[in-house]
Amino acid sequence: MPGLRHPSVLRAMTRAVADVSAARSALQVLGPRPDHELVDSSRAIVAATDAEAGGSRRVPEGDLEACRAVVRLEETHDAYEALLQEAEGRLEAVYRSAMEGKDLEEPDGRDESAAAAAGDDAAVQEEVIAVLRQAEEGKPVESVRLVDRQLRHLPEAFGRIQGLRVLDVSRNQLEVIPDAIGGLDHLEELRLASNALISLPDSIGLLLNLRILNVGSNRLRSLPDSISKCRSLIELDASYNGLAYLPTNIGYELVNLRKLWVHMNKLRSLPSSICEMRSLYLLDAHFNELCGLPSAIGKLSSLEILNLSSNFSDLKDLPASFGDLLNLRELDLSNNQIHALPDNFGRLDKLEKLNLEQNPLSMPPMEIVNKGVDAVKEYMLQRWLDILLEEERKSIAAAESPQAPTTPSAWLARSVSWVSDVSGSLVGYLSGENKTEKDAYLDQQY
């Protein structure tokens, strides 16, 4: 890289690398991040207990301290990940300067660059002002598209454009979206992709008519819980961010969601509520850090396209309910550590595309996998039928034959029971109970 000849670039890169290394080391020492649902429940318990201060405590002290420890660990992870993100951003900027052969300290060209930037800003501001003026004059403004304008700031006044249905400010330099955006009662489509957003405002949950939301390619580390209130959403794209988790209740609320893109993030798990998205048609979660899927994933009865590829060493198993995804047409499980497909995989009769590359599969055998999706379905279906037949055979055999004792204690219990029955019968006989006429005759003979 020619830029490394500049001392300022070299110094900045050295500092940035050191900071990145320190932040990563700290995160490694902290260990795995706690599960998001566990963090949510722990926070709720701590908050409820604090609210009852002075009253009777319903949570044992040991459990309460464990909840506080979970919350502290989560907050520590947040702090170090923020430091890591900031250091990586500096390193990326230094690397870009080195690739371009520039010195970070550019006194000669600074005035010209500033002047050019000022000119661009002025042009953008004029365009923004024109839109706002049109709205203030009472003229209908249903769609605003300010794409690739180097926009750094979105005025609060945008939240007062009544009747606005589409707002597209993709590929700009926005770091913040104003809270006032929650005032766009009629907004149906919001595109914020390819900006520099670190967070979204909680007021986004007020957009009750929002149908399409694209926040891909930003710097988001989480989505606000309020996003679950956007119940009209049918498409949500949050790909290419740094998401470590999704809101706990997202699936309970977004029941109309059809397409969900969360690939290229840092997700360790999907919330169990996602299984309630009965309208979900497409789920793309490739290139994350998923350790598994919710056990009830099979409840996604409308799912047709599922991409779970490239979760690498983390994804090893699929839940038993996977075979209930009866409408699945396309499935990508490549680049994982899956050893066996679920026994009921053969039930996926509508499956047309299947990618199992780069997995240590033993079931089905690789010679079957190499023959294609139809061969895999046929093999797994036959295996499933064999399993069902064997279970049925065992069930019939168990029903037709009495249960025999299989352990010494079982034999002893059965023997004692038999002796008790015999002795009871003998006592009854000798005491004269239940004697028939034939019994009396025998007594007379002796």
From Swiss-Prot:
A motif (GVYW) lies at residues 372-384. Pfam families: LRR_1, LRR_8. Disruption phenotype: No visible phenotype. Keywords: Coiled coil, Leucine-rich repeat, Repeat. SMART domains: LRR_BAC, LRR_TYP. It comes from the Eukaryota. InterPro entries: Leu-rich_rpt, Leu-rich_rpt_typical-subtyp, LRR_dom_sf, LRR_domain-containing. Residues 65-100 form a coiled coil. LRR repeats lie at residues 138-160, 161-184, 185-207, 208-230, 232-254, 255-277, 279-300, 301-324, 325-347, 349-371. Residues 101-121 are annotated as: Disordered. Widely expressed. The keyword Transcription regulation does not apply. The keyword Oxidoreductase does not apply. One of its GO terms (biological process) is intracellular signal transduction. Belongs to the SHOC2 family. Leucine-rich repeat protein that likely mediates protein interactions, possibly in the context of signal transduction. This is Plant intracellular Ras-group-related LRR protein 3. The gene is IRL3.
